Amino acid sequence: MGGPVTTSARTHVVPTESLPREAAVWMARALQDTLATQRRVSLALSGGGTPGPAYRALAAQVLPWERVDVYFVDERFVPPDHADSNYRMVEDTLLRPLRLSPSQVFRMEGEREDRAAAARDYAAKLPPVLDVVLLGMGEDGHTASLFPGHPALEETEQRVLAVVGPKPPPWRMTLTLPVLRSARRVLTLVSGAGKQDTVRRAQAGDLSLPAARVTNSEWMLDPSAAGR
């Protein structure tokens, strides 16, 4: 199959089987572009089923990985070796294959009992501006752990919050919209026909959908999500 078809300056429609590779190429180029002008680059990653294969493909990209610092967009309040841990998924697909130094990985500490303190401590670890961010989107339009109708969507001061989500395990830690909207490069990666209507609404600017509020994001979709 061919490469991505760019339908607008901000939306890329990619064959389903090529989605992981094309997302990895997008991230690698964004990292390289940033490293051309600064010594280190920050990369913030999401959990979910769609990003995992993209991280495996990213691990195969030739980059000066010793100059990349890895952060997390959100995390469940579970231990790092738990099956539901975003850290565990990223560790399995990207961190372990690359053998990144622990000093380059800034994990959200989901095992902590004081959730508010864990969120505050993570906010203190974040750089002033994230360079490259990969997001996903659920069928309900949530992104990171920012859910429709949740008060966290209106947060303007705190950079990281502990929130309760609609699915178990309910407690999550998440970056807030000001952090996501200030990032230099953002990609929202979506696949599947079940998300087609939500993608359409988000791209039309339906601000009841958290993903629509990340107005600086590019989108990478497979044909099903794009309605093709």
Locate each region found by the language model.
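N-terminal active-site beta-alpha-beta segment that forms phosphate/nucleotide-binding
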Residues: 6-118, 128
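SAM-dependent methyltransferases
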Residues: 2-10, 14, 21-23, 28, ...
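Short, compositionally biased "basic patch" segments
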Residues: 1-8, 140, 146-147
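Conserved phosphate- and dinucleotide-binding cores of soluble alpha/beta proteins
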Residues: 19, 78-228
